[in-house]
Amino acid sequence: MYKMYFLKDQKFSLSGTIRINDKTQSEYGSVWCPGLSITGLHHDAIDHNMFEEMETEIIEYLGPWVQAEYRRIKG
């Protein structure tokens, strides 16, 4: 498990964890594909679609190894 990044912009703050080979859900929403889960916890109101739009930015922030693993899993 990777301790994740802290992303912040004018709309909302997002923090959480990333787990490989685990399926994680949260009250606030998650971005998931087989073998990879990104779970977000937030302080401000945010809908699931908005969270999913952060997927690319999150993966890029996590670095080359996670990017490669994510692309390999997602195909």
Curated annotation (Swiss-Prot):
Taxonomy, superkingdom: Viruses
Protein name: Uncharacterized protein 006R
Organism: Frog virus 3 (isolate Goorha) (FV-3)
